[in-house]
């Protein structure tokens, strides 16, 4: 998978009026799309002086380490780093299954790009 291309295509679709939902199976994979995310999607509204306001919903997961440990390359938590780098993109962490659907509804209605990080139950207490 070409993660940067995936984010670039999603941004392009958003500029064309669509609201794409793009999925990165692990939060670590989103790191490979950081140029498109930080330097393009997050800054397009500012760079275009408000003319363009692309909305992309990004789904990713901070996964379980039990029963199968994905190892250090697939279990990094970059939630706070994302919140620090992104000024025009909502970053949400969801750990309760009952609130996942509502979080996606909020992301859709927010009129802004959003990252929804689904946190597996065994990571919930470790990464608040």
Model-derived regions: residue spans:
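Conserved thiamine diphosphate
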Residues: 2-5, 11-128
């Amino acid at each position: 998978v070409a993660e940067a291309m995936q984010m670039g295509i999603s941004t392009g679709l958003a500029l064309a009026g669509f609201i794409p939902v793009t999925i990165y199976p692990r939060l670590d994979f989103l790191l490979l799309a950081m140029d498109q995310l930080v330097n393009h999607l997050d800054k397009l509204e500012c760079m275009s002086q408000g003319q363009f306001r692309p909305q992309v919903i990004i789904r990713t997961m901070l996964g379980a380490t039990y029963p199968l440990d994905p190892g250090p390359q697939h279990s990094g938590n970059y939630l706070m780093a994302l919140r620090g780098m992104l000024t025009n993109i909502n970053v949400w962490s969801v750990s309760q299954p009952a609130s996942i659907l509502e979080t996606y509804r909020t992301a859709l209605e927010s009129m802004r790009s959003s990252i929804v990080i689904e946190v597996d139950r065994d990571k919930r207490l470790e990464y608040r």
